[in-house]
């Protein structure tokens, strides 16, 4: 998912990134069962349904109540929606049989950013919420009001790759102490202003709060944990020949996806010390269980029309059968 700015305005509108490429890679059987793990505003789901035959089906997942409401506008018997993280697809789809493909379009969508009340963006004044699912869980403001300095620094460093994480954490705790209440950082503007003061060196073309907001969003929504669980669940659900298509927008996500696919496509004999010393035939070595079908980036035309698509990376893999190696 990627937000984009309309020409001449600061209003964000949603534009599905790598739409045709993702659907082309995903749908290889018009009569197959498919999963869209990140419905968003339905761009991919609608395109998948357009490719499916009468016997094809699509189950979508999303944590965002607004996405669930949008999914309700799709009047198609082949389509259903689950109000849940894609990490739960294994449990939710248990007993339905294998699927022909799973699509994950990671990250945050422009409608989520554009709605100030969600608290995802430092560009809009709003409560510091940041939850994908507003019906459950702790908000970013609530977590910052109770977390200790070490935990705050760790989250900002690990999930935001922010080199000033410790300084920002110290400033947050100091602000909390000075205020005498837990609501010292209640709004997006509160946090953005604090980070701007704590970060002395600015990255060209990037607001100093960018990495901190990303880190908190990822942590509050357990995005990386969900991704790891979701990849495993997707692999288990896929039939032989089934496709796993994942679009990511930052290096933390892409590294997880890359490692997962490569671990299945290129099993290492080095993973077992005993295998390193053993004179083995090729047939005795660990066999690949997925085939890598490529890594794709948006073309120049798409990036020109939607600059924020520049960071998108799509990886595609196919599940192999036991005799495919």
Swiss-Prot record:
Where does the protein principally reside? Answer: cytoplasm
Q: Catalytic activity, per the record? A: cytidine(1402) in 16S rRNA + S-adenosyl-L-methionine = N(4)-methylcytidine(1402) in 16S rRNA + S-adenosyl-L-homocysteine + H(+)
Q: Which GO biological process entries does UniProt record here?
A: rRNA base methylation
Q: Where located? A: Cytoplasm
Residues reported to bind S-adenosyl-L-methionine? 42-44, 62, 86, 105, 112
List UniProt keywords, sorted A-Z.
Answer: Cytoplasm, Methyltransferase, rRNA processing, S-adenosyl-L-methionine, Transferase
Entry GO CC: cytoplasm
InterPro entries for this protein: RsmH, SAM-dep_MeTrfase_MraW_recog, SAM-dependent_MTases_sf
Disulfides per UniProt: none
Give an example GO molecular function. rRNA (cytosine-N4-)-methyltransferase activity
E.C. numbers: 2.1.1.199
Keyword RNA-binding: yes or no?
A: no
Q: What does this protein do?
A: Specifically methylates the N4 position of cytidine in position 1402 (C1402) of 16S rRNA.
Q: Which family does it belong to?
A: Belongs to the methyltransferase superfamily. RsmH family.
What protein is this chain from? Ribosomal RNA small subunit methyltransferase H
This chain's source organism reads Cupriavidus metallidurans (strain ATCC 43123 / DSM 2839 / NBRC 102507 / CH34) (Ralstonia metallidurans)
Per the UniProt record, the lineage of the source organism begins with: Bacteria, Pseudomonadati, Pseudomonadota, Betaproteobacteria, Burkholderiales
Gene designation per UniProt: rsmH
């Amino acid at each position: 998912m990627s937000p984009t700015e309309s020409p001449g305005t600061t209003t964000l509108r949603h534009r599905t990134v790598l739409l045709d490429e993702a659907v082309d890679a995903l749908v290889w059987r018009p009569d197959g069962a498919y999963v869209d793990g990140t419905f968003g505003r339905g761009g991919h789901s609608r395109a998948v349904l357009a490719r499916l035959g009468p016997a094809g089906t699509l189950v979508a997942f999303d944590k965002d109540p607004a996405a669930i409401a949008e999914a309700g506008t799709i009047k198609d018997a082949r389509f259903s929606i689950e109000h849940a993280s894609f990490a739960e697809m294994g449990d939710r789809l248990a007993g339905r049989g294998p699927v022909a493909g799973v699509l994950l379009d990671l990250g945050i969508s422009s409608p989520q950013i554009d709605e100030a009340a969600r608290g995802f963006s430092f560009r809009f004044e709003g409560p510091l919420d940041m939850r994908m699912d507003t019906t459950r869980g702790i908000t970013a403001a609530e977590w910052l009001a109770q977390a200790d300095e070490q935990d705050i620094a760790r989250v900002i460093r690990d999930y935001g790759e922010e080199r000033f994480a410790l300084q920002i954490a110290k400033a947050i705790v100091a602000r909390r102490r000075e205020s005498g209440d837990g609501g010292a950082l209640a709004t997006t503007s509160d946090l953005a202003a604090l980070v701007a003061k704590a970060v002395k060196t600015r990255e060209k073309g990037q607001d100093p709060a960018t990495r901190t907001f990303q880190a908190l969003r990822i942590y509050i929504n357990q995005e990386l944990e969900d991704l790891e669980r979701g990849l495993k669940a997707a692999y288990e659900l896929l039939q032989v020949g089934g496709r796993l298509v994942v679009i990511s927008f930052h290096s933390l996500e892409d590294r997880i996806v890359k490692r997962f696919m490569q671990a299945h496509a290129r099993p290492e004999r080095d993973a077992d010390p005993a295998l390193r010393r053993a004179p083995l035939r090729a047939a005795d070595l660990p066999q690949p269980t997925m085939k890598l079908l490529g890594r794709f980036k948006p073309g120049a035309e798409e990036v020109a029309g939607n600059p924020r698509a520049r960071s998108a990376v799509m990886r595609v893999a196919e599940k192999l059968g036991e005799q495919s190696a």
